[in-house]
Structure formats: C-alpha cells, structure tokens
Amino acid sequence: FATLNEMYGNRTICGIGRGDSAVRVTNGRPTTLKALRESIHVIRELGNSRAVEYNGATLQFPWSRGSELDVWVAAYGPLALKLTGEVGDGFILQLADLDIAEWMIATVRAAAENVGRDPDEIAFCVAAPMYIGEDTPESRAHMIEQCRWFGGMVGNHVADIVTKYGDGSDVPASLTDYIAGRTGYDYNSHGKSDNDHVDFVPDEIVERFCVLGTAEEHIAKLEKLRALGVTQFAGYLQHDNKEETMRVYGETVIPALTPPVTAKR
C-alpha cells in the first residue's frame, strides 16, 4: 500500500478480515481477533509512513514519506464488530440487507463510542452482488439464480458465528436462520454463479443480501443504505450480465446518487 501511494498518490484503502477462502483452501484457519487487531495496527502504521514496534524491533519504511492509509475491517460476529468499532477506520459489510446493516452499523458505532472514538469518522462500506434486470417474474428468477452463490459464501461466516455463539446470540435471526439446511461448502465453486451446492439459500435471502432489479430499484435500495450510514457500495459482478449492469450504473444509478455540481453559481 505504501508503494502504491508512492507511485500513484494517496488513493489506497486496506480492507482486512480474519481470512476465508485463501486460508481455508490451504487447510488453514481464520486468524484470531487478537492477531487481527495487531495486524491492523502494524499495517496502518507502516502504511502511514510511521514507525511501529514489531517482534521486538522498531520498523519503518525509510523511503515512505507522507503515505496515508486507512484500514477497513470486514466483520460479521459481535466480537469482530466490536473490534472494528474500536480500531477500524472503516467497516466492510459483505451483504446488503437493510435490517442486518442497521444492526451491524449500530454495533460498530456503539463500540467506537465506548472507547471514546467519534463514530462519524468511521466509513461504512457495503459489498454485495449487483444485477440490473427487467421488472418481470422471469428476469427476477434469473437474477436470483445467478446470485444465489452469494448466500452460500456468506453462509460460511454465518456458520462460524452460529458455532461460536449458538442460535440464541444477539446476531439477528435473519442472518443465522437460513443456514439450517447447509451441509458444507466446496471452495472450488467459491464466488461462481454456477455454484451447485447453494440450494439451501432461499430466494428471499438472495433478494435481501444482494441488490437486484431495475435501475430504480437499485437506486432506492442504495439510498436506504445511505440513510443508515453507508458511505460506499462495492458491487460484485460474478454473473452473466456484467456489461449491461456496469453500463446502467454508469449512465443512471451513479448519477442519481451523486449530488449535482454546477460550474458557476
């Protein structure tokens, strides 16, 4: 990140989590929250041209001058959300469900306030599949099928939460109940629209977790997310309508969500 900032100016953001597909495919396990907290500190200090204590030594990039790097934390579970509020510059929520987003954003903000931080200084990013389609039952069914893989992917993290906290935790039931029929996950199909083992994910979950439909529906949902405090949306395009979705976002969705600026007032 410091190298990229040196080359192209301060335009990078570090997104970090405990680890999923990259570590599980190599038979590893997600890291601990303690290690995550320490990693955030080390990465942020080095990425901001500052010295940091690491393994008994003081480290710094001698060539780095004036680099600026925010670290955004991806999280789902209560303790990870608490950590995010305590030390993260931003929060990455990998789903677009309005109710879950409201609960998680509030949890992160409360954790920030509890340690004396200003929650308004935290960025909130929602990352989820976006698919532009027609307002017909056939198109709706196709969009849902193309994005069902996402519910399976999120289900990995949800399964970890249920294992750790149980079914009766503070985590919203809308996030945990749907994995009851989950029997496993094949990372060879990770993030693919033709994932063949996500039948347990109901249509309703796909609708809630993703942003689907006409341009007007996308705009309406993104405006609701913005009202909850979301400051950035990162759309996934793992489906069969990439170009059209991108075109409509560029021509219609983004302009509708961007405050107008006049050249002369």
Predicted regions and their residues:
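Structural motif
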Residues: 7, 86-87, 228-230
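Short, flexible active-site-proximal loops enriched in glycine and acidic residues
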Residues: 7-17, 48-55
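Hydrophobic faces of well-ordered beta-strands that scaffold small-molecule active sites
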Residues: 12-16, 71-75, 91-93, 122-129, ...
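A short acidic, helix-capping loop that chelates divalent metal ions and anchors anionic groups
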Residues: 22-27
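Well-ordered beta-strand positions
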Residues: 45, 89-90
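Active-site-adjacent beta->alpha loops and helix N-cap segments on the catalytic face
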Residues: 97-112, 241-247
